Regions:
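Cysteine-nucleophile protease catalytic domains, especially the papain-like/related folds used
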Residues: 1-15, 93-94, 98-101
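Noncatalytic regulatory segments and standalone regulatory/sensor domains
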Residues: 29, 33, 55-101
């Protein structure tokens, strides 16, 4: 779903198997955005998608959370988000890197 949908708009999408905070930070620093399927935790009780869009110098990130605007207005710990990725997944999830090239 994610790969096919974003590829249809000419975006490059890669399923990420190294879901460490260090790798996610490197992807963000290289200009990618991340699509993350979240499990139960700080952002959701059931699971939903967020965009991890920007990393700050302190290592925290900004997200786009369609279920809760307030979550999109504050910094988040990247390790926390990686820890709360959905554990049961398919179709290349729960983490994808997206770029324009």
């Amino acid at each position: 779903l994610i790969q096919d949908s974003l590829s249809a708009f000419g975006l490059k999408v890669e399923s990420i198997t190294d879901r460490t905070a260090e790798n996610a930070a490197a992807l963000l620093q290289s200009g990618h955005i991340l699509v993350a399927l979240m499990g139960k935790g700080s952002l959701t009780n059931n699971g939903h998608f967020i965009i991890i869009a920007q990393i700050k110098e302190n290592g925290n990130v900004y997200i786009a959370d369609p279920a809760n605007y307030e979550n999109s207005t504050k910094e988040w710990d990247l390790q926390l988000l990686m820890d709360e990725l959905k554990q049961v997944y398919d179709y290349g999830g729960p983490l994808w890197a997206v770029s324009a090239d």
